[in-house]
From Swiss-Prot:
Keywords: Cell cycle, Cell division, Cell shape, Cell wall biogenesis/degradation, Cytoplasm, FAD, Flavoprotein, NADP, Oxidoreductase, Peptidoglycan synthesis. The gene is murB. It comes from Protochlamydia amoebophila (strain UWE25). This is UDP-N-acetylenolpyruvoylglucosamine reductase. Pfam families: FAD_binding_4, MurB_C. Cell wall formation. It catalyses: UDP-N-acetyl-alpha-D-muramate + NADP(+) = UDP-N-acetyl-3-O-(1-carboxyvinyl)-alpha-D-glucosamine + NADPH + H(+).
Length: 299
């Protein structure tokens, strides 16, 4: 696909931005175009621009849970930097989709509000957490969500009430809608125990996960028959390597970039894990990492 972006795009953009430098996996070639969007009106203009000019785009939050192709991305990567934060005395928090989900979890707990403690340590944005319905410790992002503001592919701003959205385990309706989550509102409850819960969660996460390694977070959804990490370990795959990609020695549901890993290394390791776990345990593991091909029109 050959195209160029005229200068009327609402934000200053970069060309050939290395995606490995802005993702937690540390993998990915250059994006043909890259832009940071900091306001909802600019997101509306940017998505409408892409729609009118038939330019493929990818919405990026904090760069976790995404695996870009080694060749990069033949389109526009839109980094969501909408990071507003407002709250009232009743525990209603309105937050931009580009805000750190981990920071939101620690801030709310520190101020005595319960409901998002589990977010502490999850390396993604609020928008990404809603998109994937991220969760841990028996809680999910959707549990305390009351509304989501979304910009569709034609730049229209839509307000969704939680009651009209169908969330399931690690899935949201936004995975099937073109556009971008731009903000959300959470209803939290006052709790004197919130801070201690949050500190316990982050302490446990640091001890049981490869906290500082280059990874995209948990690779597989937990199947009905058990925890993905335990099944992978049961299959004898802990520390298995393909190229620079390796199954973590700390937590088997993490693939880490142990060196100069490529996207193909990671994809090959994912397939190996799925095939081996299926053969040895009968369980089918479904990846929750979003692989982004170079050309989205070819897959």
């Amino acid at each position: 696909m050959k195209y160029s972006i005229p200068m009327k795009i609402p934000n200053q953009y970069q060309t050939n931005c290395l995606l490995k430098e802005i993702t937690t996996f540390g993998i990915g070639g250059p994006a043909k175009y890259f832009v940071e969007v900091r306001t909802i009106p600019d997101m509306q203009k940017t998505l409408l621009f892409c729609y009118q000019n038939e330019i493929p785009y990818f919405i990026l939050g904090k760069g976790s849970n995404s695996l870009f192709d080694d060749r990069g991305f033949n389109g526009l990567v839109i980094a969501n930097r909408i990071d507003c934060l407002e709250k009232n005395e009743k525990g209603c928090w309105h937050v931009g989709a580009g805000y750190s989900f981990s920071l939101l979890g620690s801030q709310t707990a520190r101020q005595g509000w319960e409901g998002l403690e589990f977010a502490s340590g999850i390396p993604g944005s609020v928008g990404g957490a809603i998109f994937m319905n991220a969760g841990a410790n028996g809680r999910e992002t959707a549990d305390n969500l009351i509304s989501v503001d979304f910009v569709d592919e034609q730049g229209k701003l839509i307000h969704f009430k939680r009651s009209n959205l169908n969330f399931q385990y690690r899935t949201s309706p936004f995975q099937n809608i073109k556009g971008a989550i731009v903000s959300a509102t959470f209803q939290l409850n006052a709790s004197q125990e919130a801070r201690q819960k949050q500190l316990s969660i982050i302490d446990y996460r640091k001890k049981t996960q490869p906290y500082k390694a280059k990874s995209a977070g948990c690779v597989f959804r937990n199947p009905n028959c058990g925890h993905a990490g335990a099944l992978i370990e049961q299959a004898g795959l802990k520390e298995t390597k393909i190229g620079g990609a390796a199954v973590s020695s700390v937590h088997a549901n993490f693939i880490i970039n142990s060196g100069l890993a490529t996207s193909q290394d990671v994809l090959a390791l994912i397939r190996l894990i799925q095939e081996t776990v299926k053969a040895k345990t009968g369980a089918e593991l479904e990846s929750e990492i979003r692989y982004v091909p170079y050309d989205v029109n070819q897959g």
